[in-house]
Amino acid sequence: MAAATMALSSPSFAGQAVKLSPSASEISGNGRITMRKAVAKSAPSSSPWYGPDRVKYLGPFSGESPSYLTGEFPGDYGWDTAGLSADPETFAKNRELEVIHCRWAMLGALGCVFPELLARNGVKFGEAVWFKAGSQIFSEGGLDYLGNPSLVHAQSILAIWACQVVLMGAVEGYRIAGGPLGEVVDPLYPGGSFDPLGLAEDPEAFAELKVKEIKNGRLAMFSMFGFFVQAIVTGKGPLENLADHLADPVNNNAWAFATNFVPGK
């Protein structure tokens, strides 16, 4: 069946190509057709984050970008010294991995800091430091969510693992498969139920939000790496390390610990 496309006059699809017929990959073995709306959205030409005149990694001193980095995608600053994006398939895979890891890192960074912040402001936790909290499951009473014994008790590490696999797997499966009706265009930005506030309805605002997401996500991944190193070196949470540094910046900083750090002590 030949694919047919048309331009719709609806304000939300004006000037955009919509695929009407299914491809062979969208027809399952039993002959059932999964209709998937495919809309090609281009980044706004006036945006400083997209296109050949976008912001580069070294500003005016960046030099010429590789030919395959055209500024089509958010977070493209024209820098790829290792050539990781030269192959289109590898680039598509790495782009998806980066976005997903960015989102997990942003959630993880918040989860590392927020309980410690609450604990420092009087909220009672069994253990608020992120890398110590999990060990509470082996205590006599198990692990209470939010430190409240009236909430669900987590007393089995296998049960927690199973719940996480089921819940996370269900969400990821829903995202990748495009929902029960296959209505999602892009598994990275599924919209629909994943956008209850309608933040992606305006194309220009959505394009800018993609850039903000990838920039904050990259920062969050570096933050998580820093939290891991802090946990190994100091044995303290991020806010406690920050408080120590502010109280005595000369003796509590990365250089001081790097020059005095002895593994295992």
UniProtKB/Swiss-Prot annotation:
Binding-site positions, chlorophyll a 3: 136, 146, 213
Annotated residues for binding of chlorophyll a 4: 216
Residues annotated as transit peptide in the record: 1-35
Binding residues for chlorophyll b 3: 156, 172
InterPro entries: Chloro_AB-bd_pln, Chloroa_b-bind
PTM (free text): Photoregulated by reversible phosphorylation of its threonine residues.
Gene Ontology cellular component terms for the protein in this record: chloroplast thylakoid membrane; photosystem I; photosystem II
Residue positions binding chlorophyll a 6: 245, 254
Note on cofactor: Binds at least 14 chlorophylls (8 Chl-a and 6 Chl-b) and carotenoids such as lutein and neoxanthin.
Quaternary structure, from the entry: The LHC complex consists of chlorophyll a-b binding proteins.
Protein name in the entry: Chlorophyll a-b binding protein 1B, chloroplastic
Organism: Solanum lycopersicum
Gene label: CAB1B
